[in-house]
């Protein structure tokens, strides 16, 4: 029964004392988790090796304080401990650069959503769509005060309006700010990008499963920095078109 529940319930929100990633909903986030796990495996091996070497040196040194008193240099060992770490860094850097390039690449998006950070709320614009009055669809998103939260809503995470996106659709987020530097971050989507005044940054996402994903402004932006949550609702294409018609 527990295995069935674990396969259905996804970890898409921050949890108290959480130390690992939220469940991935995009290929970018899957790549980040895979890269982290692979690198962490080798880092643990290196940590164990270095710890064993230090322990051996301290242990042998306590028995004989001057085991090699006539040894003044060791070119071989110096070459080894210079080249080996450099190779390790190259092995780590190469897949990191590939993933970084793929996360930044935006190719033929099906739709674009603009996110503008302000003190202390977000403004969203669907520039590819217009309403009945001929204007682009845009709205502001504010955090719900704790005294107005309903059952099941999360403090400092739920908002009065949310970004609605269709699943299995290439989406481009264009991020900027109107006052100070903010940061648009949604962990489950593998998105974290600065919102800078006078500058347009972009990032893409391909959401692969329906759900509600939460994020926050991740750049200290003032006294109400913690009151800038981000809520993304991923729905089917049919539900997304229905939502568009209601705007």
Swiss-Prot record:
InterPro entries associated with the record: CcO_II, CcO_II-like_C, CcO_II_C, Copper_CuA, Cupredoxin, Cyt_c_oxidase_su2, Cyt_c_oxidase_su2_TM_dom, Cyt_c_oxidase_su2_TM_sf
Membrane topology: Multi-pass membrane protein
Keyword Coiled coil: no
UniProt: Cu cation A2 binding residues: 217, 219, 221, 225
One GO MF term: cytochrome-c oxidase activity
EC number: 7.1.1.9
Self-association state and partner proteins as the record states: Component of the cytochrome c oxidase (complex IV, CIV), a multisubunit enzyme composed of a catalytic core of 3 subunits and several supernumerary subunits. The complex exists as a monomer or a dimer and forms supercomplexes (SCs) in the inner mitochondrial membrane with ubiquinol-cytochrome c oxidoreductase (cytochrome b-c1 complex, complex III, CIII).
Protein name as it appears in the record: Cytochrome c oxidase subunit 2
Record organism: Wickerhamomyces canadensis (Yeast)
Gene from which the chain derives: COX2
């Amino acid at each position: 029964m527990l295995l069935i529940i674990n396969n259905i319930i996804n970890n898409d929100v921050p949890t108290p004392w959480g130390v690992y990633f939220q469940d991935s909903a995009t290929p970018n986030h899957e790549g980040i988790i895979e890269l982290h796990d692979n690198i962490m495996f080798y880092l643990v091996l290196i940590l164990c090796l270095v710890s064993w070497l230090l322990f051996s040196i301290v242990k042998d040194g306590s028995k004989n304080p001057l085991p090699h008193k006539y040894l003044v240099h060791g070119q071989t060992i110096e070459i080894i401990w210079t080249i080996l770490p450099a190779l390790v860094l190259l092995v780590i850097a190469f897949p990191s650069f590939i993933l970084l390039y793929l996360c930044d690449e935006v190719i033929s998006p099906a739709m674009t959503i603009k996110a503008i950070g302000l003190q202390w709320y977000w403004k969203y614009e669907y520039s590819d769509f217009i309403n009945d009055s001929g204007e682009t669809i845009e709205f502001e998103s504010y955090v719900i005060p704790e005294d107005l939260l309903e059952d099941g809503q999360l403090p400092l995470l739920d908002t009065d309006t949310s970004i609605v996106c269709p699943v299995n659709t290439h989406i481009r987020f264009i991020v900027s700010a109107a006052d100070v530097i903010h940061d648009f971050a949604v962990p489950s989507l593998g998105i974290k990008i600065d919102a800078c005044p006078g500058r347009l940054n972009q990032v893409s996402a391909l959401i692969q499963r329906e759900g509600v994903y939460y994020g926050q402004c991740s750049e200290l932006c003032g006294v109400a920095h913690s009151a800038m949550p981000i809520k993304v609702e991923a729905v089917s294409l049919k539900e997304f078109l229905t939502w568009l018609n209601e705007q």
